[in-house]
Amino acid sequence: MKIILQYITLFAVVLCCFAACQNDEKESSRHMSKEKLIELNTILVRMDSMYITMYSDTMNLNSHPTPSGLWLTIHDEGNGDLIETGQTVDIAFKISNLKGKTYYTSETEGSRQIVVGKGDIEDGLNETLQMLRPHARATAILIPDKAFGLLGDNNKIRGRQILRYDIEILDVK
């Protein structure tokens, strides 16, 4: 798997260089056209999807993407109704990258209380919570724009990072 990831990374770098070096118009070499940026983003999204697919298969997660790009595996369905916007959820969690580096965990940070639907959490986490029931356990894989985007969290998580969230719903109010 490590070799495959190295080839994918090499392919992406070569493709980015190729896209950046082609200049049909007599514009400054520092400017990329909107079309080239869209093309580059499309390539990055495809590569993210391939990487997540390989990871999911390797880890036997049996995850599949939602239309928004969230990958979810529910390990324990929990009980009761689905969590709704406005409810306060207490979760145990572990946030890591797909290589296994742990960034945050409830063991060191304490459980996390979240008001579902509020804008102060990652979009992918908010979406995940609304697909779960009280006392559920799940693994969500968030593509960069569903997690911390291009900039990261300005602390431990770098930009454009695919993240794995292992979540257990402790309480819902």
Predicted region positions:
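Cross-family detector of peptidyl-prolyl cis-trans isomerase
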Residues: 3-6, 21-173
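Sec-dependent signal peptide hydrophobic core
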Residues: 5-13
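C-terminal motif of bacterial Sec signal peptides marking the signal peptidase cleavage site
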Residues: 16-20
